[in-house]
Regions:
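Active-site pocket-lining/capping segments in soluble small-molecule metabolic enzymes
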Residues: 1-158, 163-347
């Protein structure tokens, strides 16, 4: 049964790989692991668009203000534009999906199985809706929790996704293992996040409303999140950025960046189609340094250690250099199989 699931994962990943390949412009580096970027400000996106080799820009604006203009910027630069959807859509927010579809991006970054199922029920990518808008291609994000060949196969089997980012829970070695398990063609549709500030906490409690206003909720808080930047200082002095989305949910991002600079070539050798650089509040200048640095490492033109040193001195939006780490990519070490308790499957 397990072998059949792995084979199914390979087949589904292969079909998605063919769809992804057909969508790539001829100028993309089909034989290389491509670098992609996820931007959270319009300035970052504009900077990324100046790189002639970059074929795609993903936009993750927690607040929708300025998103339409950023989509137009990316499209005008001749790049593919991917728009990230919210991780959580509550009962009163079902209409949000239509807003993102009406932007007519080249793809949507889907972050929840509920939204994925909704698009499947609408007919999937290419389906024409009542308002004449077409459902774009769908990319699965890390929050779909694809952690092994079986889950990769399950998510890709329906044909709705033509790209899938693996979960953050895996070490670099485990990421490579999944890519190798689904085979060369299947790995081509897989993406791994090579650089990010880990979203360590996601809550409905709004820190902006609580500490920067006298209001109780969005109706009377005055939206301080649109005028102020906020960070939480932990017991070690690290300052973690807080961002609010359109549903007033707050995401807290780790102060230190997590980087796969030292693992990028191994992930490329494993067959990953794309490595993603996720930005939070990096400056346009650092946006260019990061993207060019990772591409240089993948092409053998830059030393990973030199990139690591450069990243460790980069300052965030508050002017602090808060360092870089391998984080979960380093792994905690796998336990011996004999030391593990039997699972229900084994019983």
């Amino acid at each position: 049964m397990r072998a059949e699931a792995v084979v199914a994962g390979q087949d589904a990943a292969r079909r998605a790989a063919n769809a992804e390949a057909s969508a790539r412009p001829s100028a993309s580096y089909a034989t290389e692991t491509a670098v992609t970027v996820l931007c959270r400000t319009r300035e970052q996106a504009q900077a990324a668009c100046t790189l002639p080799w970059l074929d795609e820009v993903a936009l993750d604006f927690l607040e929708v203000f300025g998103l339409k203009e950023a989509v137009e910027d990316v499209r005008a630069a001749g790049k593919r534009v991917v728009v990230a959807t919210p991780r959580i859509i509550k009962p009163a927010e079902e209409h949000l999906w239509s807003f993102y579809v009406k932007l007519e991006p080249d793809a949507l970054l889907v972050r929840g199985t509920g939204l994925l199922q909704h698009f499947v029920e609408l007919g999937g990518p290419g389906a024409r809706l009542e308002n004449g808008v077409v459902v774009p291609r769908l990319h699965g994000d890390f929050s779909l929790n694809a952690a092994n060949a079986v889950s990769v196969g399950q998510l890709l089997a329906g044909g709705a996704l033509d790209r899938l980012c693996l979960t953050h829970d895996l070490s670099a070695a485990q990421l490579a293992g999944v890519a190798e398990c689904v085979g060369p063609e299947g790995a081509g549709v897989l993406e791994a996040v090579a650089h990010m500030h880990l979203p360590v906490f996601h809550t409905e409690h709004c820190v902006f409303c609580r500490f920067l206003s006298d209001g109780e909720n969005r109706s009377d808080c005055g939206q301080p999140c649109e005028q102020h930047s906020l960070r939480l200082r932990d017991e070690h002095g690290a300052q973690h950025l807080v961002l609010a989305d359109q549903g007033c949910r707050n995401t807290i991002f780790a102060a230190s960046a997590q980087s796969a600079a030292r693992d990028a070539r191994d992930l490329q050798a494993a067959g990953f189609g794309r490595l993603r650089v996720e930005l939070v509040d990096e400056s346009p200048e650092d946006t260019l340094k990061l993207l060019s640095g990772y591409r240089g490492v993948l092409r053998g033109e830059a030393d990973p250690e030199e990139l690591w040193v450069e990243m460790s001195t980069m300052r965030d939006g508050s002017g602090l250099a808060q360092g870089v780490t391998r984080g979960s990519l380093g792994g905690a070490g796998d336990r011996e199989r004999a030391s593990l308790k039997p699972t229900a499957y084994q019983m």
